[in-house]
Swiss-Prot record:
PANTHER family per UniProt: DNA ANNEALING HELICASE AND ENDONUCLEASE ZRANB3 FAMILY MEMBER, SWI_SNF-RELATED MATRIX-ASSOCIATED ACTIN-DEPENDENT REGULATOR OF CHROMATIN SUBFAMILY A-LIKE PROTEIN 1
Residue ranges of domain Helicase C-terminal in the record: 490-662
InterPro entries noted in UniProt: Helicase_ATP-bd, Helicase_C-like, Helicase_RapA, P-loop_NTPase, RapA_C, SNF2-like_sf, SNF2/RAD54-like_C, SNF2_N
A Gene Ontology BP annotation from the UniProt entry: regulation of DNA-templated transcription
Described purpose of this protein according to its UniProt entry: Transcription regulator that activates transcription by stimulating RNA polymerase (RNAP) recycling in case of stress conditions such as supercoiled DNA or high salt concentrations. Probably acts by releasing the RNAP, when it is trapped or immobilized on tightly supercoiled DNA. Does not activate transcription on linear DNA. Probably not involved in DNA repair.
The Helicase ATP-binding domain, residue ranges: 164-334
Gene label: rapA
Protein's UniProt name: RNA polymerase-associated protein RapA
Subunit structure comment from the entry: Interacts with the RNAP. Has a higher affinity for the core RNAP than for the holoenzyme. Its ATPase activity is stimulated by binding to RNAP.
Keywords: Activator, ATP-binding, DNA-binding, Helicase, Hydrolase, Nucleotide-binding, Transcription, Transcription regulation
UniProt xrefs under NCBIfam families: PRK04914.1
Binding residues annotated for ATP, in chain numbering: 177-184
Length: 968
């Protein structure tokens, strides 16, 4: 290998050193100085791992002074190169630059430059890069993007709402499903879609303080969205880092109290340029035309500044008409400005609902009914569809569905309001109550008497709360270490129940964390019962581990002991037995407890066991909940209303449980009130809205389609390959779970999403739902998306060389595999990837420019090839450099046709879809005022920007592989 002083070479093994200069040569060794790092390297002349750097006409080079030059001619004299060309900055031509004056910090980014500079990647990295390009492009084109990656059951009505709302520009909607139907999950699905597509980047969630942790956990565990919790302390800290503290985070959760308490804080929130605002428990925002509450006014002010708003609220029937109108007013004050007019409008929807019911019943329609439908829809060419719907043909059902869809598009608040009820959604279990009446121990009787004397000045409410938890009264006098569990009959009953139901998973809920911890100790020490504990003092990771241990079938905990607050936001559908060791103070908390098991997807009837002590507030409350509200065995939408109306009487009975005179009458009155309210709610149900929110067959098909995509074996193979190449250790744990841990030889020292301790993953949705410690890996999971970014944003795998053993071809035959990428640059919020994601175009060229790619599929071809070590590869490249240049020029000439075809197809698709959506909404705007002007403007603006961006689309070479035929 001829070396001359002043020549420029690059290290094959340490490319980060930059360009080296030959500074010493003797008979056996050569010394290179690398000016950018100041380091020297001594190599053997005969077999040194370095590659000569030689540029060609057309290349752009940089001098050590920083100016650039386009090379037009290369001269060699005494082994040294001089480049002649035109300077980019001064346009001066005929400039000569000797290679010794080249910039030493040279980085080769183009695949061909890397190949010629000897920066040759491993063959498996090239294959991974191509697969990453291919799968990434395919995933953007897959239907229901953003709906496949969450750790949730595929429940049709939730998917229907999320699919409808998540694709809108700045959605402003009211989610008002009944309890247990998953409003939080629907909101999370919408957020996930909007964030993944780039339609939103900054999200603010406002929820009552008691639910903040639940939201934090749900967003992280189900959607991989890491929110920051802002309270007074965090806000004060952030003020040191930014003028507006909320600019320090993209995703924020705070409480209404936090927002309301400070005018400056509200101003900062309004100025923080959120894309989406989510408000949970929005029915607690009090409003009247004359006196809206401060909380309502604060949210109203925020809603004026934030483009997208999701309000989660109780059902409209529970709220009452005025309160329901107040929520809609937050979404669109221009549309909902007059309460009286709104009430009148609601009455007018009755004929539409009747028409929908008529169509769904499948009966033949009279001429009058057909005419009425035609008038309601108001389309000129509706006649053929009406005739088809009224015929006996096979198309009748689909025609009726289309008519129903058109009616719902044009009438009612269906674009801004979604509401599902348990009546309209299948899949809920029965709930069976088992009460166990137990005697009140003398120790408790004594403690209660003393407490009554000493606490005479306490309010009735405080006495009532004390009486619900006699063990705490006992501890007040005997000390925190008092062993109440030695005599409390509930403990004895619980141990007996658990030992006789060893095969059952049992969820035990009590009000306080201390009770849960004491029960765990007793169960473990006395009966050897495996019990996990779950309370608010534990970190999210500790709770995950406890939940995972409870979920394990054979070796897991039999019991999970939960405190009231600790169990928020967690669901354990795999268990169907629940023990309430004590009772919560109000019906909402009772429903929340039962809701841990009573979810869609629960496979068994729920057995609710309530051991209670006679002559205590527990005995009063268990009767009131069961006989007065029927709250154990059915959901109770009337609970809060009745609770508020009889609060004072109920508190007195709870505070003095031995004085029961008149209690039977109270229960009877409550039951009558409950039945009357329930009937009233049922009568007020909006069937039209339910049909729209539920989604019917369309929603079912959506769930089935995503379920099919869950079985994508390509993902598993790709992920394992990706983890191997990044350098992530994989340990198969069985049960469809794998433990990933970082290794010492990773491509990057800290891979986002992979902690030092490692993580457990699964590709199985059912396993992920049962095991909260296992992350559910899909194409949308951050681990995969970060891996794709790591490979595709750098030059990993962009140039390689392989040998093809094929005796049918002459030795030394050259093939060049080119991977071009066709793409358009645009802001993320345009969601250009719907039409033209970065798309790979593969070419396999021989030296005559014949493209053999269609004849030899990538994976088949890849299996026939053998790797070449880097040093041998560099020698091969140097030997055929001119031939490769010629083939590259042939590739450049051919790619334009393929790229143009892709770009034109994307333009046509974008124009067709966006124009159709705009036309549909413009037509509906004439008959449905719930379509906002700003939505139409945004779609038109989006269409124009998308078309302009596609006009600017181009292509570039992303990777290349040189293939040399051999017979050995």
């Amino acid at each position: 290998m001829p070396f001359t002083l002043g020549q420029r070479w690059i290290s094959d093994t340490e490319s980060e050193l930059g360009l080296g200069t030959v500074v010493a040569v003797d008979a056996r060794t050569v010394t290179l100085l690398f000016p950018s790092t100041g380091e020297n390297r001594l190599y053997a002349r005969s077999d040194s791992p370095v590659t000569r750097v030689m540029f060609n006409p057309g290349d752009t080079i940089t001098s050590h002074d920083g100016w650039q030059m386009q090379v037009e001619e290369v001269k060699e004299e005494n082994g040294l190169l001089t480049y002649i060309g035109t300077r980019r900055d001064t346009e001066e031509s005929g400039v000569a630059l000797r290679e010794v004056f080249l910039d030493s910090k040279l980085v080769f980014s183009k695949p061909q430059d890397r190949l010629f500079a000897g920066q040759i990647d491993r063959m498996d990295r090239f294959a991974l890069r191509y697969r990453a390009r291919k799968y990434s492009s395919e995933q953007f084109r897959m239907p229901y993007s953003g709906l496949r990656g969450q750790r949730t059951s595929l429940i049709p009505h939730q998917l229907n709402i999320a699919h409808d709302v998540g694709r809108r520009h700045a959605p402003r909607v009211l989610l008002a499903d009944e309890v247990g139907l998953g409003k939080t999950i629907e909101a999370g699905m919408i957020l996930h879609q909007q964030l993944l597509s780039g339609a939103a980047e900054r999200v603010l969630i406002i929820v009552p303080e008691t639910l903040q942790h639940q939201w934090l956990v749900e967003m992280l565990r189900r959607f991989n969205l890491r929110f920051a919790l802002f309270d007074d302390e965090r806000y004060a800290e952030a003020q040191h880092d930014a003028y507006n503290p909320f600019d320090t985070e993209q995703l924020v959760i705070c409480s209404p109290d936090f927002v309301r308490r400070s005018k400056q804080r509200l101003e900062h929130l309004c100025e923080a340029e959120w894309d989406l605002l989510v408000v949970d428990e929005a029915h607690h925002l009090v409003w009247s035309e004359d006196a809206p509450s401060r909380e309502y006014q604060a949210i109203e002010q925020l809603a004026e500044h934030v483009p997208g708003v999701l309000l989660l609220t109780a059902t409209p029937e529970q709220l009452g008409m005025e309160s329901h109108f107040a929520r809609l007013r937050l979404l669109d004050p221009n549309r909902f400005h007059d309460f009286a007019q709104f009430v009148e409008e609601q009455k007018n929807y009755r004929p539409v609902a009747d028409a929908v019911a008529m169509l769904l019943a499948g009966n033949k329609l009279s001429n009058d009914e057909l005419n009425m439908l035609g008038e309601m829809i108001g389309e000129q060419d509706i006649e053929p569809l009406l005739q088809a719907a009224n015929s006996d043909s096979e198309d009748a059902q689909s025609a009726r569905q289309e008519l129903v869809s058109m009616l719902m598009d044009r009438h009612g608040t269906s674009r801004v309001l979604f509401r599902n009820t348990r009546n309209g959604v299948k899949g809920f279990p029965k709930r069976e109550l088992h009460t166990i009446k137990l005697p009140l121990p003398t120790q408790y009787q004594t403690a209660i008497k003393v407490s009554g004397i000493m606490g005479a000045r306490k309010s009735a409410e405080d006495r009532a709360r004390d009486m619900l938890y006699p063990e705490r009264i006992y501890q007040e006098f005997e000390g925190d270490n008092a062993t109440w569990w030695n005599f409390d009959p509930r403990v004895e009953w619980l141990m007996g129940y658990l030992t006789s139901h060893r095969s059952q998973k049992v969820l035990v809920i009590c009000a306080k964390a201390a009770t849960a911890l004491q029960l765990e100790q007793v169960l473990r020490e006395r009966e050897g019962i495996r019990a996990a504990v779950f309370h608010e003092g534990m970190s999210i990771i500790e709770r995950d581990r406890a939940a995972a241990w409870f979920a394990e079938e054979d070796t897991g905990a039999q019991v999970l002991l939960c405190s009231e607050i600790g169990s928020e936001g967690r669901n354990f559908q795999f268990a169907s037995h629940m023990v309430m060791f004590d009772l919560p103070f109000n019906p909402d908390l009772l429903e929340q407890r039962i809701g841990r098991l009573d979810r869609i997807g629960q496979a068994h009837d729920i057995q609710i066991h309530v051991p209670y002590l006679e002559k205590t507030a527990q005995s009063v409350l268990v009767r009131w909940y069961h006989e007065g509200l029927d709250a154990f065995e059915h959901t109770c939408p009337t609970g809060r209303t009745i609770y508020d109306s009889v609060y004072n009487d109920l508190i007195n009975y709870l505070a003095s449980p031995d004085q029961t005179e008149g209690f039977d009458d109270l229960i009877k009155n409550c039951r009558e009130q409950h039945e009357a309210l329930k009937a009233q709610l049922e009568q007020g149900r909006d069937r039209l809205l339910e049909i729209h929110s539920n989604g019917g067959e369309k929603a079912q098909a959506l769930a089935e389609s995503i379920e099919e995509q869950d079985d994508d074996t390509n993902l598993i193979a790709f992920a394992m390959n990706l983890f191997d190449i990044i350098g992530i250790n994989q340990d198969d744990r069985g049960d469809n779970m794998i433990v990933l841990t970082p290794s010492d030889h990773m491509l990057v020292p800290d891979f986002p999403g992979l902690s030092e301790d490692g993580i457990t993953i699964t590709f199985d949705r059912e396993v992920a739902l049962a095991r909260e410690d296992a992350q559910f890996i899909t194409w949308e999971h951050p681990l995969i998306r970060n891996g794709l970014d790591l490979i595709l944003s750098g030059d990993t795998g962009s140039s390689t060389i392989s040998l093809l053993k094929n005796k049918a071809l002459p030795v030394g035959t050259l093939l060049v595999e080119l991977i071009y990428v066709v793409e358009a640059q645009a802001p993320k919020q345009l969601q250009l990837n719907r039409f033209l994601p970065p798309t790979p175009v593969r070419m396999l060229l021989d030296k005559n420019g014949n493209n053999l790619a269609a004849l030899v599929e990538f994976e088949t071809f890849n299996r026939q090839l053998n790797a070449v070590n880097r040093h041998t590869g560099s020698k091969l490249v140097n030997a055929v450099q001119q031939d490769v240049h010629a083939i590259l020029q042939l590739g450049e000439a051919q790619i334009e046709k393929s790229a143009r075809a892709l770009i034109d197809a994307a333009r046509n698709e974008a124009d067709e879809k966006l124009s159709a959506e705009l036309s549909r909404l413009e037509a509906l705007r004439a008959v449905n005022p719930n379509i906002r002007d700003d939505e139409l403007t945004a779609i038109e603006s989006n269409r124009q920007q998308v078309m302009e961006s596609l006009d600017q689309a181009g292509w570039r070479l992303d990777a290349l592989r040189l293939i040399v035929v051999t017979h050995q």
